[in-house]
């Protein structure tokens, strides 16, 4: 079975590299995290021109009588030249991802002091710039920026920061969820409890963490502990993750002020990561087997029963030369085969400004040097080498999936494009889905879905952020600090933008309108993604952590030229607040503010710790914020936008060729205390009657409900448990009961974390008082023993 759906997804980071990116203030995640987090930061939606492709692989039973499902997933946003290959080839991942990933901003949060917001930003002490191993400081100094952590349990995800209070670390969520997140030690790991009392342990020791840039970047899921103390354990192995192409950079080395040479550097993308080796659960085990020659490429997944009997083997065939998954065979389902665009990456330099392949033979990175700099002598090398080529951008992209039934789905792509509002230039970044063709062998028919993008099908979207050539420069190094001449300066040009790095290659273009054409007609959806800062006075650099993706505001379904169905959406923003911070950047292209250094060389350099090497003016004489005075630093107040963003109302009008439409309106109400709890729905129709459904939670209480039970449910993080429901019909000013339900929960021997339903009561219009319908008893650790109905009969 193959499932296509528009889901809340993720974007990936530019791949981690040892050399040119080693001194960035923004850290890099590992290759597998990069692939997994693509779904976090490049949301799968029509508004981004993507479709999510999921193939169910297997499920394992859990002690709480549910299942954990694992899926093979492909992200259709395009393959960049420097993308990590992962364990199955370009574009493919196995979800869920089973890890927490840190995005480091500034310095590592657990090893430095938080810079106060009221700090005198015109004078910075040397301690702010202290580096981990400097001889001058015993500490790392201050840090004004928050590292952001991204977590995925089996069915929930969120992002959070850590804060230090009284030498203890606590987690603060950016988007509120029922998850309870606890920091283990000095961010050695995390304990996460979901709203059913299930505990997830991430990290904790070196076997379950991956360290880069002097801090823990990845925390692997170690175990899931259920309320009856049974566990599911995960075991990993460390392997080298590669790509078929090395990352490239140019170094412009000045030997004198007028003489320089270009050194091109190949940086093989070879980095360790942890790959899943086995999963042990109470009723069996899952093992992951990898190729002998490419130990990071997955070959088989084997599922065993509790008697070690092999139940089934899922086989993957990957072309290890092209790094493309060819097929997967799943017992009980059959074989899925995959076909790709035949264009491959022949020249690593052949990348556009966003890392997509251009196919050009003699391409270099030199052409993107800004022409208004001292390096204008390099203009002789500037060409059009990094402009995008639509056909080449499709290199290695998935084009067809053949089902076990003989049916197939094929994909056609086109370039993502938007108009830069600053200079009206056209920005091209990545691919969008143009057409999807679905063939069904049972009726020998092919159904096509075609997509048109932009307002009134203009073909152009909107930019999330403005691109800049300067984002492709990284730090300069000076070998002789006593020499104030040009000697020893090194400029580096990297292959991918630091904005791609900063936002983990998040999507640059989104569409406010998308039309889907099918043989039955068309559907037009409108989206919004304009963030209203609300007068906070801070630049909210991380608002997308809360809003996550463009959200639908309008949907029309057409039959011919006539609208058959029209739905409008309204949203709530609740408990909006800001996690404040201070972002500090060195403006130094040269390690000095000496007047003999030309002012025009003093460009922003996206690097803070360079100041700790070059010793800028810090003893009260520093100038900041005035580019005409050769400033050493630029200081920006910023905020991480937090709260909860949810659907508030949905109104649908059904025309059905009638002059007066039939209207259905649904309003969604939420708790004032726990914003993620929906307390009610109000459904209204144009006929006049309304249905109000009210949900009660432990924090709300309910007349006649034992308060001790409510307190226990809240204490055990079971705050989303519905204890009672009432449904009422509203006709004008009259209200009448339709039905009601009340469930009494209690603890049972052997399981003092979870609460179990022991009695259920019902009422309705004819029986307005609650009447017990059934009663349950349990064996120790939660297995149902008996259920007795209202008639006294037990099973």
Regions found by a protein language model. Give the residues of each.
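Beta-strand elements of repeat-based all-beta scaffolds
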Residues: 189-192, 222-225, 243, 276-280, ...
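Long, intrinsically disordered, low-complexity, charged/polar and glycine-rich segments
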Residues: 17-222, 226-229, 265-267, 348-392, ...
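Extended serine/threonine-enriched, polar tracts that run as long, contiguous segments within proteins
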Residues: 278-333, 660, 675
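Glycine-centered tight beta-turn/hairpin loop motif at sheet-sheet or coil-to-beta transitions
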Residues: 63-65, 155-157, 176-178, 193-197, ...
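Outer-membrane beta-barrel pore domains and translocons
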Residues: 73-75, 237-239, 416, 698
């Amino acid at each position: 079975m193959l499932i296509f759906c528009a889901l809340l997804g993720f974007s990936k980071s530019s791949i981690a590299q040892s050399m040119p990116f080693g001194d960035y203030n923004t850290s890099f995640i590992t290759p597998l995290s990069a692939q997994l987090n693509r779904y976090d930061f490049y949301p799968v939606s029509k508004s981004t021109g993507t479709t999510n492709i999921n193939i169910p692989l297997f499920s394992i039973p859990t002690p709480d009588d549910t299942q954990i499902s694992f899926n093979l997933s492909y992200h259709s946003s395009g393959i960049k030249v420097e993308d990590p290959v992962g364990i199955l080839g370009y574009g493919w991942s196995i979800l869920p991802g089973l890890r927490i990933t840190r995005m480091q901003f500034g310095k590592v949060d657990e090893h430095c002091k938080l810079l106060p917001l009221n700090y005198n930003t015109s004078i910075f002490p040397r301690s702010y710039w202290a580096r981990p191993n400097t001889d001058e400081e015993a500490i790392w100094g201050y840090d004004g920026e928050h590292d952001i952590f991204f977590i995925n349990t089996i069915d929930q995800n969120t992002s959070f920061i850590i804060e230090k209070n009284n030498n203890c670390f606590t987690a603060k969520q950016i988007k509120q969820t029922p998850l309870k997140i606890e920091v283990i030690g000095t961010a050695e790991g995390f304990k996460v409890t979901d709203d059913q009392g299930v505990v997830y342990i991430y990290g904790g020791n070196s076997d379950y963490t991956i360290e880069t840039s002097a801090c823990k970047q990845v925390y692997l899921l170690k175990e899931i502990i259920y309320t009856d103390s049974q566990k599911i354990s995960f075991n990993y192995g460390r392997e080298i993750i590669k790509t078929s192409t090395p990352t490239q950079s140019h170094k412009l080395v000045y030997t004198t002020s007028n003489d320089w040479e270009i050194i091109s550097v190949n940086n093989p993308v070879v980095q360790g990561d942890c790959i899943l080796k086995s999963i042990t659960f109470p009723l069996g085990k899952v093992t992951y087997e990898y190729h002998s020659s490419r130990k990071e490429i997955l070959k088989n997944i084997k599922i065993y029963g509790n008697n070690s009997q092999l139940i089934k083997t899922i086989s993957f065939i990957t072309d290890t030369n092209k790094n493309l998954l060819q097929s997967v065979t799943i017992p009980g389902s059959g074989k899925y085969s995959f076909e790709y665009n035949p264009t491959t990456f022949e020249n690593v330099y052949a990348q556009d400004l966003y890392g997509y392949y251009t196919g050009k033979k003699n391409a270099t990175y030199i052409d993107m040097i800004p022409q208004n700099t001292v390096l204008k002598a390099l203009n002789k090398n500037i060409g059009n080498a990094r402009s995008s080529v639509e056909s080449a951008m499709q290199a290695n992209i998935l084009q067809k999936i053949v089902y076990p039934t003989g049916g197939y789905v094929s994909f056609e792509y086109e370039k993502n494009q938007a108009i830069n509002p600053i200079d009206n230039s056209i920005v091209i970044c990545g691919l969008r889905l143009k057409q999807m063709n679905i063939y069904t062998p049972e009726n020998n028919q092919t159904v096509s879905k075609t997509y048109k993008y932009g307002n009134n099908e203009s073909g152009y979207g909107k930019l999330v952020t403005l691109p800049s050539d300067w984002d492709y420069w990284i730090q300069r190094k000076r070998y002789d600090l006593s020499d104030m001449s040009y000697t020893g300066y090194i400029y580096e040009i990297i292959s991918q933008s630091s904005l791609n790095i900063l936002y983990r290659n998040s999507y640059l273009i989104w569409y406010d309108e998308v039309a889907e054409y099918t043989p039955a007609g068309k559907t037009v959806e409108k989206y919004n993604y304009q963030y209203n800062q609300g007068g906070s006075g801070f630049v909210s650099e991380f608002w997308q952590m809360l809003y996550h993706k463009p959200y639908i505001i309008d949907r029309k379904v057409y039959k011919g030229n006539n609208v058959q169905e029209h739905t409008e959406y309204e949203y709530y923003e609740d408990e909006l607040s800001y996690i404040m911070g201070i972002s500090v950047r060195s403006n130094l292209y040269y390690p000095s503010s000496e007047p003999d250094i030309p002012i025009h060389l003093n460009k922003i350099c996206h690097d803070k710790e360079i100041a700790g090497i070059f010793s800028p003016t810090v003893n009260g004489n520093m100038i900041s914020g005035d580019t005409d005075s050769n400033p050493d630093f630029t200081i920006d107040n910023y905020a991480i936008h937090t709260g909860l963003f949810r659907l508030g109302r949905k109104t649908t009008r059904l025309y059905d060729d009638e002059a007066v439409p039939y209207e259905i309106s649904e309003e969604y109400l939420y708790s004032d205390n726990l914003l993620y709890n929906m307390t009610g729905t109000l459904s209204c129709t144009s006929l006049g009657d309304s249905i109000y459904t009210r949900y009660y939670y432990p924090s709300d209480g309910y007349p006649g409900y034992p308060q001790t039970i409510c307190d226990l449910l809240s204490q055990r993080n079971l705050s989303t448990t519905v204890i009672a429901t009432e449904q009422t019909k509203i006709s004008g000013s009259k209200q009448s009961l339709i039905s009601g339900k009340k469930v009494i929960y209690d603890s049972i021997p052997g399981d003092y974390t979870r609460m179990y339903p022991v009695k259920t009561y019902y009422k309705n219009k004819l029986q307005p008082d609650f009447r017990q319908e059934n009663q349950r008893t349990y064996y120790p650790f939660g297995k149902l023993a008996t259920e007795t109905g209202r008639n006294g009969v037990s099973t």
